[in-house]
């Protein structure tokens, strides 16, 4: 529901603009209000799940998201819709931030955990394609209000199931005090960073607005890390970055989603503005990506991760992704779907279907149990910031190249396609860099698992809990070795 909402709205924007009288610049805030709230609260929400209980945070976020969806659906003014979208982003971030943390604490057996993460990864990775199709179908069949109303029964059903099925947990508590300065610095820096990125389409990268707000966001982020390094009870213990796999997996994900998000956004524009597809056709065109992700995430990746390890499953996926993007970067002005587009979409689906479950497994397996909510929030934050930054950069590059070609006398379609080609080629390059980082920097699964077991033991001893005899038997995140 939350993943779909990030793309389902895109297809309905023309109808929303017509009904509510948005200008082209103000229309962007239907998307930006959600992104700023969603990206800004993820890290804090993930950590709050560790501290006061993930089920509590999940249900609070789900309630906010569902209620805000109702407000979005009944909106009759620009201000009401933008405000409701901001609240929807807050609720979505609270729910999304703790999901992976709940998975790794509920499913402690490696095989079960791999299956659960694979299901989550399918939803996260294929949501973009499914959202485009659902948005087009609902907007054309009924009206744009229903892209929000559809969330309400899903949200209610999910809430009832969560209350009945999820185990209650108190969390580890705030110890002696809450890190209020850390929380304020975290939320303000991330919200400001996402705001700066999404507004580059209006102000440009070299403008005083972008440079000023970007510098302020970075300064606040530096202040946040300084605070966490010196606080007695930090909101985000920096020990999480002691795990190389946590750090590298998040970096690899940022590069990967930067390319994929750019491909979805610019690819949809290419299909509509160059090839003349309507909204439903765009969704159907991207459907092979979702189907390939489903086939691999739900049927194959979990078994591969359990058998060969997450790193060894990730590498082939990251190898296929840049090949798919490079193939897409040669799409002609009169493309035939079966020969020019379908192979690229199939390769992208295969690459994402192998990569997302593996990356999430690596990022979560590198964190201790008590930091699992924080690790979950970090994974989602990396995905949002990486995707927003990648989309902004690739869209700017595409626009610049299009303007150059238009000035040189190219037709509108040829100029647009020239811009898309450059952006997709850069997206392929980003994915190739992600592949190289994964190959050279990620540690084998069994090495990372042993390090986590050692850190958990050190935490137990430091708190006077004594040694955990289970550590002598097997670390919790024990996958097949990849030597």
Describe the role of every protein-language-model region.
Residues 16-17, 48-49, 134-142, 197, ...:
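Interfacial helix-cap and linker-helix signal at transmembrane-aqueous boundaries
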Residues 172, 441-483:
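Intrinsic disorder in cytosolic terminal tails and internal cytosolic loops
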Residues 53-62, 76-80, 95-99, 105-118, ...:
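C-terminal module of multi-pass small-molecule transporters
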Residues 36, 70-71, 86, 147, ...:
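Hydrophobic residues within the alpha-helical transmembrane core of Major Facilitator Superfamily
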Residues 1-164, 299, 308, 314, ...:
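Transmembrane-helix bundle of Major Facilitator Superfamily
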Residues 152-171, 187-199, 216-231, 434-444:
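C-terminal membrane-cytosol helix-exit motif in multi-pass small-molecule transporters
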Residues 2, 31-34, 38, 65, ...:
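Structural signature of transmembrane alpha-helices in multi-pass secondary transporters
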Residues 3-37, 181, 206-213, 219-223, ...:
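Transmembrane core module of solute transporters
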């Amino acid at each position: 529901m939350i993943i779909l909402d990030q793309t389902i709205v895109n297809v309905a924007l023309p109808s929303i603009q017509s009904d509510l009288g948005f200008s082209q610049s103000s229309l962007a805030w239907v998307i930006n209000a959600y992104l700023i709230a969603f990206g800004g609260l993820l890290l804090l929400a993930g950590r709050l799940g560790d501290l006061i209980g993930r089920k509590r945070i999940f249900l609070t976020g789900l309630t906010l998201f569902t209620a805000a969806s109702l407000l979005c659906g009944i909106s009759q003014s620009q201000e009401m819709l933008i405000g409701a979208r901001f609240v929807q982003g807050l609720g979505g971030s609270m729910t999304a931030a703790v999901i992976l943390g709940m998975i790794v604490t509920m499913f402690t057996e490696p095989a079960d955990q791999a299956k659960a993460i694979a299901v989550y990864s399918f939803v996260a990775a294929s949501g973009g394609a499914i959202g485009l199709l659902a948005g087009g179908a609902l907007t054309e069949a009924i009206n744009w209000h229903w892209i929000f109303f559809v969330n309400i029964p899903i949200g209610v059903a999910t809430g009832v199931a969560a209350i009945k099925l999820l185990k209650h947990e108190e969390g580890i508590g705030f110890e002696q005090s809450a890190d209020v300065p850390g929380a304020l610095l975290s939320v303000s820096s991330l919200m400001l960073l996402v705001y700066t990125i999404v507004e580059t389409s209006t102000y440009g990268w070299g403008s005083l607005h972008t440079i000023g707000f970007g510098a302020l966001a970075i300064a606040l982020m530096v202040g946040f890390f300084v605070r966490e390094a010196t606080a007695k009870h930090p909101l985000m213990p920096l020990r999480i970055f002691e795990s190389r796999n946590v750090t590298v997996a998040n970096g690899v994900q940022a590069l990967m989603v930067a390319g994929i998000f750019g491909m979805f956004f610019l690819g949809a524009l290419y299909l509509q503005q160059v090839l003349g597809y309507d909204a439903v056709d765009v969704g159907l065109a991207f459907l092979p990506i979702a189907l390939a992700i489903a086939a691999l995430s739900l049927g194959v990746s979990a078994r591969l991760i359990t058998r060969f390890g997450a790193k060894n499953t990730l590498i082939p996926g990251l190898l296929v992704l840049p090949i798919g993007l490079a193939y897409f970067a040669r799409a002609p002005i009169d493309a035939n779907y079966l020969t020019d587009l379908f192979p690229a979409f199939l390769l992208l689906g295969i690459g994402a279907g192998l990569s997302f479950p593996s990356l999430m497994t690596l990022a979560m397996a590198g964190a201790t149990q008590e930091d699992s909510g924080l690790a979950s929030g970090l994974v989602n934050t990396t995905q949002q910031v990486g995707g927003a930054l990648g989309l902004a950069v690739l869209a700017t590059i595409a626009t610049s190249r299009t303007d150059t070609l238009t000035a040189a006398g190219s037709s509108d379609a040829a100029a647009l396609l020239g811009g898309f080609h450059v952006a997709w080629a850069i997206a392929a390059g980003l994915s190739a860099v992600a592949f190289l980082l994964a190959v050279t920097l990620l540690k084998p699964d069994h090495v990372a698992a042993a390090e986590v077991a050692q850190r958990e033991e050190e935490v137990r001893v430091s708190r006077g809990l004594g040694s955990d005899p289970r550590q002598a038997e097997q670390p919790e995140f024990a996958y097949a070795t990849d030597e």
